[in-house]
Each structure stands twice: as structure tokens, then as C-alpha cells.
């Protein structure tokens, strides 16, 4: 099980605005600053209201090295993420659709964030 992911982004403000809008349809709406004992003022976190598990760190991104997949509860949530992410400035890589070549019930979309990170949202029904 994965506890958290940290993406390096080139512009905090732009990326925080993008992810706040794009992840909202997935119920990932909690934006917080890291407040651990060891500092890290350069971390901004998103979560589900219980804990932060998706973090942004400002620096020099390497988007070719990153693919992050988020879980959606149904097809409508996949579609809503795709629209919200593109409306927030992301670039559609692949529109929402069934991917039976992966296996039956796989429905997903892919969007590139403002730095080019490859984001997937999938419902496995």
C-alpha cells in the first residue's frame, strides 16, 4: 500500500490551483501546508479530510518519470475529473473511455498537469 506521493512542480500557485480544481470531483479537496517537526515549508498536501497523501514540492519537475493513478468511485467521477482538470489548465491526453484491453470494467482518463505530469483517473467496475 502506498502512503503518499510527492510531485515536484515548477510553480506552487499554479499547481495548487490546478490540483484543487482537478481533484475536487474525486473528493480530494483538503489543501494543507506541511507542519511536521522537520520543517519542509516547500510541501503542500492534498487529502480526503482525514490525512494528506498527495503532496506538491516546488523545484525542477521531471514529468517523464511520473505517472500517478487516482481511484474514482464510478464513471461519472472519471468524467468529472477529466472536465475539471482540463478546465483548470491541464491537457487531455486521452478522453474518458472503457479500456477493455486492460481488463473488463476498466474505465479511465489521462490528463497532463501544467508541468506535464501524467495523471490517470480510473474506475474499475
Residue ranges of predicted features:
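N-terminal beta-strand motif that seeds the catalytic metal site of vicinal oxygen chelate
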Residues: 1-16, 68, 125
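Core segments of cupin and vicinal oxygen chelate
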Residues: 8-51
Amino acid at each position: 500500500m502506498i502512503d503518499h506521493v510527492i510531485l515536484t512542480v515548477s510553480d506552487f500557485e499554479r499547481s495548487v490551483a490546478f490540483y484543487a480544481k482537478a481533484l475536487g470531483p474525486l473528493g480530494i479537496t483538503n489543501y494543507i501546508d506541511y507542519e511536521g517537526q522537520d520543517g519542509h515549508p516547500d510541501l503542500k498536501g492534498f487529502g480526503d479530510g482525514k490525512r494528506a497523501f498527495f503532496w506538491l514540492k516546488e523545484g525542477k519537475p521531471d514529468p517523464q518519470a511520473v505517472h500517478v493513478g487516482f481511484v474514482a468511485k464510478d464513471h461519472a467521477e472519471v468524467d468529472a475529473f477529466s472536465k475539471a482538470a482540463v478546465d483548470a489548465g491541464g491537457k487531455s491526453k486521452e478522453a474518458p473511455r472503457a479500456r477493455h484491453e486492460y481488463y473488463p470494467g476498466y474505465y479511465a482518463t489521462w490528463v497532463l498537469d501544467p508541468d506535464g505530469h501524467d495523471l490517470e483517473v480510473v474506475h474499475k467496475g
